[in-house]
Amino acid sequence: MTAERTEITVVGGDKTGLIARITSLLFERGINIEDLDQAVRDGLFRMSMRVDAEGMTTEREELRTALAELGRELGVEIQVRFPSDRETRRLAVCVTKESHCLEAVLDAAADGDLDVEITAVISNHGTLRSLAEAHDVPFYDIGDDSGSPDEDRMLEVLAEHDIDLIVLARYMRILGPKIVFRYEDRIINVHPSLLPAFPGAAAYRQAKEKGVRIAGVTAHYVTTDLDQGPIITQRAFDVPDDALIDEITARGQPLEAEALLEAIELHLSDAVAVHRGRTSLRDGVDPERYQLGLTRAAQAANPTAPVDREIDRQEIEGGD
């Protein structure tokens, strides 16, 4: 087990001395903290730690038990994750009504292109139930008559299936901090724009109205700030002068699925590190096999350094 693979997450009410109590318990068991981050949103406290457990002087289950008991005493939930515990990750897909991304993820898992077990499809509408059930994946409709999701029920489903990764495959609702904090850097969303441009709803329409020449899609980790999480992959496409919204959407949707699948594969391969809001490839990852951002073809067409060329100064200035 490597230090970077051991994560501890604390979620609950803020309390004086909480951090000291938890870190002391870890130090007493030979666990060194390599990175610690904390935040408060809507009255909910979150602390995440990456720890070096190679010198741990206790068993894993004893550590989990001790932290759970301390969490109950402090009124918080403490999770310990050893991703090396499982060879196959468990994935939940959240959707609303659009099917193209869900279908792509289900097909990729069924074909073995993604080394993952999809154990739940969660939605705020019942529209895509038949698609999930056709792939023998349990479907959970957590929305009311207006489509508002019950996030407490979502948390129950995620816990019931012991979910490692949540994929928002065109899920048209904003996740609250009670979910985002518990699954930090484990929720991937695909958004139909080249973020940070055009966040929020109707991104293709926003792009059309602003007259952009190039539009695109972004797969990113989810944070409590809408469409501002660390970017994993992006795809771009040309927007013709006379393109209608439906035509832009038709160009973008296949790329949404492509960017999302690549982001999932990068995450499952443990190739992505996140630091201060930016993704990077982990040390030791083969850059020829994995990459972040645009495809190599797109990068080749957009050089990072100016291209030298002869310029006819008189022609530019209108001289003879």
Where are these predicted regions, by residue range?
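Short, surface-exposed ligand-recognition loops at beta-strand->loop->(often short) alpha-helix junctions
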Residues: 10-18, 95
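Short amphipathic alpha-helix segments
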Residues: 15-34, 67
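Short, well-ordered turn and helix-capping elements at secondary-structure junctions
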Residues: 14, 35-37, 194
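N-terminal glycine-rich anion-binding loops that anchor highly charged ligand groups
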Residues: 30-44
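One-carbon transfer enzymes
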Residues: 42-44, 48-320
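Short glycine-/aliphatic-rich beta-strand segments at the starts of folded cytosolic domains
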Residues: 2-12
